[in-house]
């Protein structure tokens, strides 16, 4: 699955392609959209060096079918006091799900065939995208858009 920069970049690419009306709903809540781009991956950063209930929840969410989250998210968006804020987060999460779902089969196949770890593939993919975009992977803060 892609890592931080790939999700950030994909979300930015998607945002500019959305219809103007939808983009205008998201833009005031861009930090929520940006947070949604990382889906449950954000839970992996909580006490990252040890297993705990938060990162286990992140792993469990990755194992569930997307409909579990999206059914709940639809209810939240429909009942939220600020529908556009909830929508911004949910649409960011949709981007996360779409990119993971597309890339995951390739990553898993490459992992099986090469012996390279899932994390190594994610890291190198992010590094390739960073270099392609003119950034130094060693110095670029990939999570600078998350507030």
Predicted regions located by residue number:
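Short alpha-helical catalytic segment bearing the HExxH-like zincin motif
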Residues: 89, 93
């Amino acid at each position: 699955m892609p890592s931080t920069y790939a999700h950030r970049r994909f979300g930015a690419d998607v945002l500019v392609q959305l219809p103007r009306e939808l983009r205008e709903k998201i833009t005031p809540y861009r930090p929520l959209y940006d947070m949604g781009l990382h889906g449950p991956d954000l839970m992996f950063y909580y006490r990252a060096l040890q297993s705990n209930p938060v990162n286990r929840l992140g792993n469990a969410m990755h194992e569930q079918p997307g409909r579990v989250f999206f059914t709940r998210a639809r209810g939240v968006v429909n009942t939220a006091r600020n529908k556009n804020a909830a929508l911004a987060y949910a649409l960011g999460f949709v981007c996360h799900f779409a990119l993971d779902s597309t890339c995951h089969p390739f990553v898993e196949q490459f992992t099986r065939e090469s012996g390279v770890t899932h994390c190594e593939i994610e890291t190198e993919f992010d590094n390739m995208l960073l270099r392609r975009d003119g950034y130094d992977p060693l110095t670029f803060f990939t999570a600078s858009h998350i507030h």
